[in-house]
């Protein structure tokens, strides 16, 4: 609200890292341009077995509102000291992509790790391969079914755009937008 009142177009990403953030998640997603799923911090306050469940719910809620999601913390933690990730880490990255996260973030791996370049390249390879495997038509249908209310014009145009792009096997979608909202809705 403060940013809007001052006429700024700065995008706000809200870091969700504790129970208070989880309890206010819907309002936070609505108010922000996106969220960061800070799994490491969450794991300190929230039981470990709840973190993956909450991660999936947070991504789903943000995607439903056409908001960005950054999944972060310990994505390739083993690459701080090793040149290759664990298979579990590779699977974790792919699952975040399959769930609909719009960005994955390295922390210690690139800030203080012994293999920062390798970590970036590895994460990129895993993400790109996962993206190639996504059933985008199925994802679009699930997003459409998850919506509770009647779609507005932008949402209807977004679905139609994605459907036509899928039918034509389009390599890309280009959209004109003033605020980026239409592009975000198409991207989800």
Protein language model regions, located:
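Non-catalytic helical/linker scaffolds that mediate oligomerization, partner binding
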Residues: 1-188
């Amino acid at each position: 609200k403060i940013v809007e009142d001052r006429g700024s177009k700065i995008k706000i990403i809200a870091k969700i890292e504790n129970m208070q953030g989880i309890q206010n998640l819907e309002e936070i997603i609505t108010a922000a341009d996106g969220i960061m799923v800070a799994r490491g911090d969450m794991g300190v306050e929230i039981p470990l077995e709840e973190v993956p469940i909450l991660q999936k719910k947070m991504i789903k809620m943000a995607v439903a509102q056409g908001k960005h999601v950054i999944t972060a913390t310990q994505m390739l933690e083993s690459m701080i000291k090793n040149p290759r990730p664990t298979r579990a880490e590779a699977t974790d990255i792919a699952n975040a992509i399959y769930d609909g996260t719009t960005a994955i973030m390295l922390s210690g791996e690139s800030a203080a790790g012994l293999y920062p370049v390798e970590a970036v390249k590895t994460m990129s390879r895993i993400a790109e391969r996962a993206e190639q495997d996504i059933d985008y038509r199925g994802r679009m249908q699930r997003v459409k079914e998850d919506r509770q209310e009647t779609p507005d014009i932008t949402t209807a145009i977004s679905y139609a755009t994605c459907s036509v792009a899928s039918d034509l096997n389009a390599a890309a979608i280009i959209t004109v937008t003033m605020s980026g909202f239409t592009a975000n809705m198409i991207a989800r």
